[in-house]
């Protein structure tokens, strides 16, 4: 089975950045978000993972930049939007901007009834981001704790969640390899699909994730590994096929 790859474009203060372990203030600036997204599309990406970090941290938003990316590239690539989607207004804005799929994170922990209602309404256009430290969920902008991972999954499974985006916060942006055990554990406990995120640093990491395909891990988000040129997107896509 092939693995779908989603190059990430994380936007803070109008610029494409990468964080270390999701910490505000740890940014490395990579310039224009639109240029970054163009690069990944030209390199063969079928999906882009687009994150509004200011919205996630509650420090404003980059809605105009995100809309510009979707407007130019939305007919060439599927766009998954993430960051600060926690109510009807923010979800509707992302969907109206042209997102093929929207990730909700904090809201799934803070407002389960709302989360259940939007999963029911939008089906596989909504994924839930599970940002994990150990077996504990990290909530708003990765700052607060949000409860037990598997208790939360049990609820989300019961309301029909179709996809989890699983990030080991300790590994994100650290180039230290993905948490294969965590991915295996999550995937083996749910019928939902799983997107792997965080820590991917070499092509062998993608090969290891691909081995979890039969459990339902069918996608991976690539961030710092691409920006730091650990490998090219073309090389990664070749491995993922």
UniProtKB/Swiss-Prot annotation:
E.C. numbers: 5.3.1.16
Active site residues per record: 10 (proton acceptor), 131 (proton donor)
BP-aspect Gene Ontology terms: L-histidine biosynthetic process; L-tryptophan biosynthetic process
One Gene Ontology term of the molecular function aspect: phosphoribosylanthranilate isomerase activity
Pathway linked to the protein: Amino-acid biosynthesis; L-histidine biosynthesis; L-histidine from 5-phospho-alpha-D-ribose 1-diphosphate: step 4/9
Superkingdom as given in the UniProt entry: Bacteria
Keyword Amino-acid biosynthesis carried by entry: yes
A GO cellular component annotation in the UniProt record: cytoplasm
Disulfide bond listed as a keyword: no
One Pfam family hit: His_biosynth
Subcellular location: Cytoplasm
Keywords for this protein: Amino-acid biosynthesis, Cytoplasm, Histidine biosynthesis, Isomerase
Reaction(s) catalysed by this chain's protein: 1-(5-phospho-beta-D-ribosyl)-5-[(5-phospho-beta-D-ribosylamino)methylideneamino]imidazole-4-carboxamide = 5-[(5-phospho-1-deoxy-D-ribulos-1-ylimino)methylamino]-1-(5-phospho-beta-D-ribosyl)imidazole-4-carboxamide
InterPro entries: Aldolase_TIM, His_biosynth, HisA/PriA_Actinobacteria, Isoase_HisA-like, Isoase_HisA-like_bact, RibuloseP-bd_barrel
CDD domains from the UniProt entry: HisA
Family note: Belongs to the HisA/HisF family.
UniProt cross-references to NCBIfam families, sorted A to Z: hisA-trpF (TIGR01919)
Record's protein name: 1-(5-phosphoribosyl)-5-[(5-phosphoribosylamino)methylideneamino] imidazole-4-carboxamide isomerase
Originating gene: hisA
